[in-house]
Each structure stands twice: as structure tokens, then as C-alpha cells.
Amino acid sequence: MSNEYFDPKLKIFSLNSNRELAEEIAKEVGIELGKSSVTHFSDGEIQINIEESIRGCHVYVIQSTSNPVNQNLMELLIMIDALKRASAATINIVMPYYGYARQDRKARSREPITAKLVANLIETAGATRMITLDMHAPQIQGFFDIPIDHLNAVRLLSNYFGERHLGDDLVVVSPDHGGVTRARKMADRLKAPIAIIDKRRPRPNVAEVMNIVGNVEGKVCIIIDDIIDTAGTITLAAKALREAGATKVYACCSHPVLSGPAMKRIEESPIEKLVVTNSIALPEDKWIDKMEQLSVAPLLGEAIVRVHENASVSSLFE
């Protein structure tokens, strides 16, 4: 991508969820971030001011709905409304991490489908396009009636491990049945077999038993997941793999939510290295030596340029 992009009608704005990533994306595209400010009234209400003309412009707003989830979501909705009222030609939301994605269906009676509600809010506010990364449930794309580009970080994560030459005895592991498609994509890139962690609870109030489907004895295992939240699943999976004879266990994910006891669990686990992306900004207290962070800015920057130029983005999905 060129160092400078000469279309004054292309604007990129950042809100507060991940300004560092937004700056990287703007640098990848070759433009400066747009000027805006986010302030608060004395009672906590959010006030947004766009400090330059965006009339007739194609605007891209970088905002993950990560912690604080509700604050970041309200910032985004208010920003969309401000852009709409300032006569932006298109309002494109770049949401590296889509919060509330784990509430994508009614698992029990009288539950909301909050992922659909969030989609409705974004559309109603005035967004004209979504660009996002590794949604927890890909079918959330169907909750939107506007175009949505659903990118994934499998290529980025696969390249990281491929460049480390971990040997011929690699196995890519899905920590549950829902992640098999993701694991298979990485396995195809690394030319490795896959294994699956099959979690079962024999009866109520009895601890889950982790069965491993596939051969991991004497193998180097790479666990891939979309989200690591409290890290319970992934650290228990790593322990089960080592007990089954794996020589080393690595882990990676697109979205490092890392809530509650996550850092302690990862530190004490047999995981050699945890590789994450910067879809979520990580404070210093969510950082340990065995972690490494990869940037999704080149991927998102390329997507922005292709969308703006009406070029195909299909190769970015692979």
C-alpha cells in the first residue's frame, strides 16, 4: 500500500476503544486520522464533536465494542448519528471486535438475542456498511441488511507459526466443536492434521471431562480460538493435551478479552506462547512474557482501500 492516499473524500475516524490500532490503520492507508473529540457531560453522558467537514465524504469509523462494552457501543452510535447529520456520503463501521456476539441465539427460554439488537442499533443509527473480524458466530452477518465484510485472522496467525518452523509433527487443535472450521483453515495452511477437544459433563454437578479426538502424542499442538475471555477452556485444553502426550502447546486467538482470572490461568498453564491480535487494546496489567501480539492493521487497511475503490475484497476472506 502506498504511503499517501490522495482522495480527500476518504476519511478515517477513531473513537476511544482502540486508538492505537486506528492510527496504524490510517498509516497503512496513507492518510491522517480525522479530527473529532469525545467528551462527557457532568452526569456521564457522551458528547461527540466532529472537528472538520465530512460533507459528501466516505467515512470509516474504527471502534471495537470491547470493555467497557456499553460505553464503546454508545460512543459508536452517537458518532454514527453525528456523521449522518453532517451529511457524510457513506458511514462505514470498522469493528475489529464485535461485542455481544456470544448472545446470538435463544439458548434458553426468555433470553434476548442481543447480537441482533446491536445490529439493529447500528443500522438504525445510520451505518451503511460494516467491516468486522472473526465474529464469534458468523451467522450474525445475516442480522444486518447492509453490506458486511467479515474478515478473519487465520492467515495472519498461520503465517506466524509457519515462520517459526515448529517441525513436521504439528497438530492444530480446536478447543470445542464450534471452532472446527477455524482450526481446519489453519491446518490447511500449515499442512497439518487437526484434533478436537470434546468436553462432556457425565452428569450434573460433575466436572467436565475433556476427551481428545485425534492423535496428539509426541506432537506440537496449536490451539486456535476466536475469543479468550476467562481462559478457562483454553488452559484446561492445554493441560489435557500435555497429559495426552503433546510435547508442546501453543495457543492463539483473534480477540484477547482476557477477563477476571485469565492472566493468572495463562501464566500458570502449560501454554508455551499465546499469540493474539490487537483487535482489542490491552492494558499493561493484561500482558505477560509468554504473550505476543500481531497487528490486524494491514488487513483492515487493505479492506478499507478496496471497499473505497469498489474493488473485490474476496481474497481477504481466505
Swiss-Prot record:
S-adenosyl-L-methionine keyword on record: no
Residues annotated for Mg(2+) 2 binding in this entry: D176
GO CC annotation: cytoplasm; ribose phosphate diphosphokinase complex
Cofactor(s) listed in the protein's UniProt record: Mg(2+)
Homology family: Belongs to the ribose-phosphate pyrophosphokinase family. Class I subfamily.
Known function: Involved in the biosynthesis of the central metabolite phospho-alpha-D-ribosyl-1-pyrophosphate (PRPP) via the transfer of pyrophosphoryl group from ATP to 1-hydroxyl of ribose-5-phosphate (Rib-5-P).
Name of the featured protein: Ribose-phosphate pyrophosphokinase
Name of the gene this protein is made from: prs
